[in-house]
From Swiss-Prot:
Protein's cellular compartments: Cytoplasm
HAMAP family assigned: CsrA
Biological process according to GO: mRNA catabolic process; negative regulation of translational initiation; positive regulation of translational initiation; regulation of carbohydrate metabolic process
Recorded family membership: Belongs to the CsrA/RsmA family.
UniProt KW keywords: Activator, Cytoplasm, Repressor, RNA-binding, Translation regulation
Protein name: Translational regulator CsrA
GO MF annotations, alphabetized: mRNA 5'-UTR binding
Length: 67
């Protein structure tokens, strides 16, 4: 596992087309923004696990929208 330190407003790149930006830190929560092509699925881990189990009904719809 690669461990990186980033400050609010800083970005890291995954490959040529995915960027992850630290939007804010409040207590023990970190808000991140992810920019990725439409053909790259981006899910929270618990949603991804539901999809893998075939339990998509438990999802909230598009995971690419802000929560």
């Amino acid at each position: 596992m690669l461990i990186l330190t980033r400050r609010v407003g800083e970005t890291l790149m995954i490959g040529d087309s995915v960027s992850v930006t630290v939007l804010g830190v409040k207590g023990n929560q970190v808000r991140i923004g992810i920019t990725a092509p439409k053909d790259v699925a981006v899910h929270r881990e618990e949603i991804y696990q539901r999809i893998q189990r075939g339990d998509e009904a438990g999802g909230t719809g598009s995971e690419n929208s802000a929560e």
